[in-house]
């Protein structure tokens, strides 16, 4: 349980290390993260910090959310995200505070959550990496068919979770253990090694890695 940041994916590029290696990185814009609410064990039963980022037109904000933000004295943002934290961490924040990119350090491992790029309705080959059937030798119309999806009269049904064709992508997923290679405090940009889920401009959530790796 630790505080993170929300932002958007700018895109991918590369930087060069001191030894000349080309390092592929994803640029994340985590500017203007503002605290909208502080939750404490006394009032809410747990400790958490709620943040928002970016800007949103007032006409796009519903009355309940507008009232919530007005109470905190915070301008409407693009999204709200709550981070569970330790009880002692809550004391260091109050509504309206700005959380900067210096929350992270170079070399630190982070987990990045985003919405994967949607691929539409896809077959089992693309969606689940199934192999195709035989091209010939008696096969005529079943080249990319999934094959059998059940058994016999017993159980007489298709079990839930059976891998079949359907919507592929457009799901929330997390890439774990990405290394922070650069922290741009001036422009509030975070550069992490490798790719993160989602398309350019997509919302992302960055938090310290939950799994320690050597």
Curated annotation (Swiss-Prot):
Q: Which UniProt keywords apply?
A: Methylation, Ribonucleoprotein, Ribosomal protein, RNA-binding, rRNA-binding
UniProt modified residues of type N5-methylglutamine: 153
Quaternary structure and interacting proteins, as annotated: Part of the 50S ribosomal subunit. Forms a cluster with proteins L14 and L19.
Q: Which NCBIfam families match?
A: L3_bact
Source organism per UniProt: Aromatoleum aromaticum (strain DSM 19018 / LMG 30748 / EbN1) (Azoarcus sp. (strain EbN1))
| Source superkingdom | Bacteria
Q: Which gene encodes it?
A: rplC
Q: PANTHER family annotated for this entry? A: 50S RIBOSOMAL PROTEIN L3, LARGE RIBOSOMAL SUBUNIT PROTEIN UL3C
- Which GO terms label this protein's molecular function in UniProt? rRNA binding; structural constituent of ribosome
**InterPro entries this protein is in?**
Ribosomal_uL3, Ribosomal_uL3_bac/org-type, Ribosomal_uL3_CS, Transl_B-barrel_sf
**Gene Ontology terms: cellular component:** cytosolic large ribosomal subunit
What the record says about family reads: Belongs to the universal ribosomal protein uL3 family.
Its job:
One of the primary rRNA binding proteins, it binds directly near the 3'-end of the 23S rRNA, where it nucleates assembly of the 50S subunit.
Q: A biological process (GO) annotation for this entry?
A: translation
Modification(s) after translation: Methylated by PrmB.
Name of the protein in its database record: Large ribosomal subunit protein uL3
């Amino acid at each position: 349980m630790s505080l993170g940041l929300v932002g958007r994916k700018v895109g991918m590029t590369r930087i060069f290390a001191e030894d000349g290696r080309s390092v592929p990185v994803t640029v994340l814009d985590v500017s203007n993260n503002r605290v909208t609410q502080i939750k404490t064990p006394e009032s809410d039963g747990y400790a958490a910090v709620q943040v928002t980022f970016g800007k949103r037109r007032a006409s796009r904000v519903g009355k309940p959310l507008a009232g919530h933000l007005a109470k905190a004295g915070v301008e409407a943002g693009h999204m709200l995200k709550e981070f569970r934290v330790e009880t002692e961490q809550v004391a260091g924040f109050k509504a309206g505070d700005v959380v900067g990119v210096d929350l992270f350090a170079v070399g630190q491992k982070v987990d990045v959550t985003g919405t994967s790029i949607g691929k539409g309705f896809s077959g089992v080959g693309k969606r689940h990496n199934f192999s195709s059937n035989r091209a010939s030798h008696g096969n005529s119309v079943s080249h990319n068919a999934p094959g059998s999806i059940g058994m016999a009269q017993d159980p007489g049904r298709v079990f839930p979770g059976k891998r079949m064709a359907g919507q592929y992508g457009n799901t929330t997923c997390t890439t774990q253990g990405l290394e922070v290679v650069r922290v741009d405090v001036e422009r509030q940009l975070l550069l992490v090694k490798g790719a993160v889920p989602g398309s350019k401009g997509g919302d992302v959530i960055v938090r310290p890695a939950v799994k320690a790796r050597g």
